[in-house]
């Protein structure tokens, strides 16, 4: 015991004499001295835990405990302050004061970056607290009815600038998150394009929460509805949003083509022996392609879809038998949506034949042929608005010399099979103009 006291005393004297040691070495020596003092105290016979500790050990331990307690109180105070600021931001956002909410959100996240995950909202019967009127259940987060509002609360605010997304990995290149909101919305309008490719917009919303919010922008869906229905959709009633109107209201689809296949059997010529007569199975297809600007194309041909569908991407097709025109949507009192179209054959300017210009020829009575088509729009299976049923087909012949019009109506029989929609990816592979 005497040797241990001499070692402790000599170490203390040596530490006091060597004032030129670094701060790290001095801290290490102080910890060693405290440990040895406590060890000596425990080895002293007759001294229990109730006895008074030596002054160096008691002072060192009290200083460490005090520092830890002070640090813990500071962390609790900081978290409590961040909690109050975050709840205040939620309250301001619910009241419509978005700028004030942004300010409180930013201050709260500067204190505690993950404060949103440390808050548990409760509702008390008398509830007079700031967050008493809000409920959050992390276990039932997937059952939230308004996912858009939830994502808006999860946005990250930095230096008063709304950041829709953050890079997952560090990169030296410029990330899309640095773009302002206006530029991002313009990019989203290019994604939708003039072809109304809202399917790509929905896929884009799966990237992150910020893109989800941009994809739910009411202006994009309002412009899409105006392009489809025009002035007949000036009121939202009975729909709650423009997006719901576009998804639920009956409309023709633009990202593909409606196709029908008709098959019939006709009798062939009789053979020479008189005992055999050929029968022919005839197959032909009808194709109808709609465009958002009100144009429509129709083609009847025996060629199969793989060879015809690529030609119908634009109206500038070189197919001779194509019929071009305009269409409109009509909703009757029975809540059935019908499509009416007037189509005509593409006009071709024939060059003048100067070979027979001196011969008298019998004038041919020129006439214009217009076809009037009526279709009923309905859904079948799991797809919406993917079926067109024939309800009217007629040919209007207008003679240019007299101006008279002759109408020939066709009977809608089994030869007019329904047309079913087939989506074509190449139709929306690239954009020509923004929405």
From Swiss-Prot:
Q: Name one Pfam family in it.
A: F-box-like
Q: Any idea where this protein resides?
A: Cytoplasm
Q: Which UniProt keywords apply?
A: Cytoplasm, Phosphoprotein, TPR repeat, Ubl conjugation pathway
Does the keyword field hold Phosphoprotein? yes
Q: Which parts of the sequence are annotated with region: Disordered?
A: 1-25
PTM-bearing positions, type Phosphoserine: 124
Some GO term, biological process aspect, for this entry: which one?
proteasome-mediated ubiquitin-dependent protein catabolic process
Q: What PROSITE patterns is this protein classified in?
A: FBOX (PS50181)
Q: Which residues form the F-box domain?
A: 173-224
Keyword Cytoplasm assigned: yes
As one GO molecular function, the record gives: ubiquitin-like ligase-substrate adaptor activity
A GO term from the CC aspect: SCF ubiquitin ligase complex
In which pathway is this protein known to take part? Answer: Protein modification; protein ubiquitination
Q: What is its main location?
A: cytoplasm
Q: What does this protein do?
A: Substrate recognition component of a SCF (SKP1-CUL1-F-box protein) E3 ubiquitin-protein ligase complex which mediates the ubiquitination and subsequent proteasomal degradation of target proteins and plays a role in several biological processes such as cell cycle, cell proliferation, or maintenance of chromosome stability. Ubiquitinates mTORC1-bound TTI1 and TELO2 when they are phosphorylated by CK2 following growth factor deprivation, leading to their degradation. In contrast, does not mediate ubiquitination of TTI1 and TELO2 when they are part of the mTORC2 complex.
The record's note on quaternary structure and interaction partners says: Part of the SCF (SKP1-CUL1-F-box) E3 ubiquitin-protein ligase complex SCF(FBXO9) composed of CUL1, SKP1, RBX1 and FBXO9. Interacts with TTI1 and TELO2; when TTI1 and TELO2 are phosphorylated by CK2.
Q: What is this protein called?
A: F-box only protein 9
Tell me which species this is from.
Rattus norvegicus (Rat)
């Amino acid at each position: 015991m005497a040797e241990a006291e001499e070692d402790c005393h000599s170490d203390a004297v040596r530490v006091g004499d060597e004032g030129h040691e670094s701060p790290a070495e001095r801290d290490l020596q102080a910890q060693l001295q405290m440990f040895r003092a406590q060890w000596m105290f425990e080895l002293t016979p007759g001294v229990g835990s109730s006895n008074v500790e030596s002054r160096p050990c008691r002072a060192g331990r009290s200083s460490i405990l005090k520092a830890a307690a002070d640090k813990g109180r500071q962390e609790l105070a900081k978290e409590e302050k961040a909690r109050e600021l975050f709840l205040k931001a939620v309250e301001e956002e619910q009241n419509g004061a978005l700028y004030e909410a942004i300010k409180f959100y930013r201050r709260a996240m500067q204190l505690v970056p993950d404060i949103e995950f440390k808050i548990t909202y409760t509702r008390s019967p008398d509830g007079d607290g700031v967050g008493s009127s809000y409920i959050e259940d992390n276990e039932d987060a997937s059952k939230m009815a308004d996912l858009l509002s939830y994502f808006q609360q999860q946005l990250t605010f930095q230096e008063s600038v709304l950041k829709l997304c953050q890079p997952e990995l560090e990169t030296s290149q410029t990330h899309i998150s640095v773009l302002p909101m206006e530029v991002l919305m313009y990019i989203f309008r290019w994604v939708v394009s003039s072809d109304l490719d809202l399917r790509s917009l929905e896929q884009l919303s799966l990237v992150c929460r910020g893109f989800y919010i941009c994809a739910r922008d009411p202006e994009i869906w309002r412009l899409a509805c105006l392009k489809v229905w025009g002035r007949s959709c000036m009121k939202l009633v009975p729909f709650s949003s423009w997006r719901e109107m576009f998804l639920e209201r009956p409309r023709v689809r633009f990202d593909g083509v409606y196709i029908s296949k008709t098959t019939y059997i006709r009798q062939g010529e009789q053979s020479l022996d008189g005992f055999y007569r050929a029968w022919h199975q005839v197959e032909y297809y009808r194709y109808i392609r709609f465009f958002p600007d009100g144009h429509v194309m129709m083609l009847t041909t025996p060629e199969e879809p793989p060879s015809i569908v690529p030609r119908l991407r634009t109206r500038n097709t070189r197919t001779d038998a194509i019929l071009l025109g305009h269409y409109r949507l009509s909703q009757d009192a029975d809540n059935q949506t019908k499509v009416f179209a007037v189509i005509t054959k593409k006009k071709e300017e024939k060059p003048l034949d100067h070979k027979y210009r001196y011969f008298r020829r019998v004038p041919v009575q020129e006439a214009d042929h217009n076809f009037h088509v009526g279709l009923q729009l309905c859904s079948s299976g799991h797809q919406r608005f993917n079926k067109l049923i024939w309800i009217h087909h007629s040919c209007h012949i207008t003679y240019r010399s007299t101006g008279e019009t002759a109408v020939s109506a066709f009977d809608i029989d089994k030869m007019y099979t329904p047309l079913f929609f087939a989506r074509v990816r190449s139709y929306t592979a690239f954009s020509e103009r923004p929405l």
